[in-house]
Structure formats: structure tokens, C-alpha cells
């Protein structure tokens, strides 16, 4: 997968956060156009003035923080490309048993990729990961793995360990384990 498609997916995830996906998806062709089809080498050169002009473009969602994240995330991709050859190679080499570490890396090196954005982007990109949805967190609490939504490194460590153990026992991908765990919660 070319890096421009990863940048497009990252931006799509960022813009979908907190909004109806259908609203973002309906405008996505316009995003592709104004961000030069998410070519990281072009996007990284976008000036603050250019981003300000995009705030006037009614064809896209005009959220300054999210718009500013696109060039920053392009820089992250270019930095990763320099070290690993491509963003896809970077994702492929990341150990499967350290999803939380990958989430933290993306949140720290990128912009607007905290919370559930990194794991949801990874799912969109085809990288196996679990997602801490409300139901998954409720199931983890019910199994005494955590006492509340895990956010700190310390709280996330036992979650990663539990998913690693379940994967070793079952042979199932983390995405399936996450979904199965969510189904154990009674509403």
C-alpha cells in the first residue's frame, strides 16, 4: 500500500472522530483533491496560510485542529519512510504482541491520534489490533483485568497481556478477540 493511502486513512480516521462517518465519507473526494491525494511529500509543505485558506473551503469539514494534523501526520510518515522504507513496512515489523506500544507511538509522533483513533486507524489499515470500545472495557472490568477505562501505560499493560494470552490460547486475531469480548457484555 503506498504511503499516500496510509496518510489518507489517517486523515479519514481523524476527521471521522466525533462526527458521523457518513458526513465525512460524503466529502472525502473533496479532501483527496484539496490535500493533493495525500501525497506526503506535497502535504508536508502546506503552510499555515494554506491551512487557513482551507478553513474557507465549504467542500470539506472545516476543523482547524484536524486540518493542521494532516501536514504533521505527513511528516510522521516521511520520517518513518526514511527509517523503514515505507509506512507499510513499519507497520509490518511492529510486534503483534505490542499493540499498545504502537498506539502510543502513533499518538506521540502523529497528531490527533490519541484515544481510540490509533487503534481504529490500524483496523482500517488492516493491522490486527484490539479496540477498547465501551463494551470491551466493560468486559475487561467484569473479568477483573482493569477497574476502569485504561488510559495510562500502567493500566494498559495488563490489557495487552490478557489479549496476548487469549491470542496464544485461541489462535484468533486480536480484532476477533476484541469483538468476541464485546459480545460477552449484557445490556
Language model: regions and residue ranges:
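N-terminal polyanion-binding entry modules of DNA glycosylases/AP lyases
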Residues: 1-63, 67, 180-187
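Alpha-helical ds-nucleic-acid-binding substructure associated with the helix-hairpin-helix region
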Residues: 37-112
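Short, well-structured alpha-helical segments
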Residues: 25-28, 64-74, 115-122, 137, ...
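C-terminal accessory module of base-excision DNA glycosylases/AP lyases that mediates lesion recognition
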Residues: 92-187
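Alpha-helix N-cap and coil->helix boundary residues
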Residues: 23-26, 45-46, 82, 131-135, ...
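Buried hydrophobic packing segments
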Residues: 10-11, 73-77, 140
